[in-house]
Each structure stands twice: as C-alpha cells, then as structure tokens.
C-alpha cells in the first residue's frame, strides 16, 4: 500500500518542498508506519511506500484539512 502521510488530528497531508528524494518524508513515514516503509516528496506532500494494508493515509473520511 502507498499513500500520503496524514495528520490524524487535522486531516492535512504532511507538506514538503524538496520534491523527490526527501529525508524529512522518509523519517516521518518510518516514524508513523514502521521502519520497513519509505517515503519521498510528491506534489508537495509526503508520499509513503511499503505500508501495511490497514495503514491510515490521506484523505481521512469526514475530516477536511482546515
């Protein structure tokens, strides 16, 4: 599974500005989803890879980013 890293309180994606390989996104994805996951910056949001099937990713149901 893959998807955008999301803040469960706000419903917002984690923003990033250095597109492609991005240490911040890698670190945040690993912290949220475990060390087997990876991440990079895609369309100014952290995109996480190698997630477990039940991983919660953006968008969250009934929660908009405000």
UniProtKB/Swiss-Prot annotation:
Has the structural arrangement of an alpha-helix connected to antiparallel beta-sheets by disulfide bonds (CS-alpha/beta). Beta toxins bind voltage-independently at site-4 of sodium channels (Nav) and shift the voltage of activation toward more negative potentials thereby affecting sodium channel activation and promoting spontaneous and repetitive firing. The keyword Disulfide bond applies. GO terms for cellular component: extracellular region. InterPro entries: LCN-type_CS_alpha_beta_dom (IPR044062), Scorpion_toxin-like (IPR003614), Scorpion_toxin-like_sf (IPR036574), Scorpion_toxinL (IPR018218), Scorpion_toxinL/defensin (IPR002061). This is Beta-toxin Css6. The keyword Secreted applies. Keywords: Amidation, Disulfide bond, Ion channel impairing toxin, Neurotoxin, Secreted, Toxin, Voltage-gated sodium channel impairing toxin. GO terms for molecular function: sodium channel inhibitor activity; toxin activity. PROSITE patterns: LCN_CSAB. SUPFAM superfamilies: Scorpion toxin-like. Disulfide bonds join 12-65, 16-41, 25-46, 29-48.
């Amino acid at each position: 599974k893959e998807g955008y890293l999301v803040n469960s309180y706000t419903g917002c994606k984690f923003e990033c500005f250095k597109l492609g390989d991005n240490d911040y996104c890698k670190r945040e994805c690993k912290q949220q989803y475990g060390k087997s996951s990876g991440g990079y910056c895609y369309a100014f949001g952290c995109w996480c890879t190698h997630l477990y099937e039940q991983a919660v990713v953006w968008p969250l149901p009934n929660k908009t980013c405000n």
